[in-house]
Amino acid sequence: MQARNIGLDVSVPEKECTDPHCPFHGNLPVRGQVLTGKVISTAMTRSVVVAREYQQYIPKYERKATKIKKYHVHVPDCIELRVGDTVRFAECRKLAKTISFVVVEKVKQ
């Protein structure tokens, strides 16, 4: 099965899969936001938790505070991830109650 073009400038995984929720080998369209974050948990089946850090200015204290936003992200079978990997993930339709993003590329380990 040949990987399809998903419309993003990302590298296609070398491994093939039969996951219907894979943007490359299945029929899941990606749209909207494309974000980058760090994998903090791989305990779920075919899914991971990805954290993004950002700074928010607090006027009362005239300081910036670091905050963390967590995303539940689906991982296709053709992409292998471990805790600590940096990944690029894209928005898609809802796959579960809390999952509406899918991993499209592993940036670095």
UniProtKB/Swiss-Prot annotation:
InterPro entries the UniProt entry points to: NA-bd_OB-fold, Ribosomal_uS17, Ribosomal_uS17_arc/euk, Ribosomal_uS17_archaeal
Coiled coil: none
GO BP of this protein: translation
GO molecular function: rRNA binding; structural constituent of ribosome
Subunit annotation: Part of the 30S ribosomal subunit.
Family: Belongs to the universal ribosomal protein uS17 family.
Name of the molecule in the record: Small ribosomal subunit protein uS17
Organism: Thermoplasma volcanium (strain ATCC 51530 / DSM 4299 / JCM 9571 / NBRC 15438 / GSS1)
